[in-house]
Amino acid sequence: KEFFDVSWLLGVAFEDDCRAVVTDDLDGDGRVDLLVTEYKTRGDWDAFRLKVLRNNFESDNHWIGVRLRDTAEGGSAIGARVTVEAGDRPLVGRIVTGDSFTAQHASVMHFGLGERERVESLTVEWADGRSVTIDGPEIDRYHNLATDAGH
């Protein structure tokens, strides 16, 4: 299999240096958007410009997401492991920070489910070892959990 660069077809081929990339579903519609900072040097000064690329592609595919919120009692969402049991293999993600140069992602996980219309469970394992599981969670929406969930 080969990969082809089609970024110019989608309007994401930038001529200048783009140093930070963050993905997030900015409008909560289940389609992940892209934020990019463009860096330009103009003589003796530097300029940064934020570009927001909204995902407006229509899709009948399903998804599920989780938004993790820090609490004073529960600590940080950073390091949490999120597992979605949906069919023959688990979908797993970890909340991290700093995985893109000069950028930080929100404490949000988004999982594409394709044509699957059901999820068996969604589990969050916090960095301190606590966990919380939602059995049969609703799809095509975000589930909000605080770090003190699972006490």
How would you name each of these model-derived features?
Residues 2, 8-17, 31-151:
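Gly/Ser/Thr/Pro-enriched helix-cap/hinge segments flanking short amphipathic alpha-helices
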Residues 18-22:
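Signature of short aromatic-glycine-proline-rich micro-motifs recurring in repeat-based ectodomains
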Residues 23-29:
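Acidic, divalent-cation-chelating loop motifs in proteins
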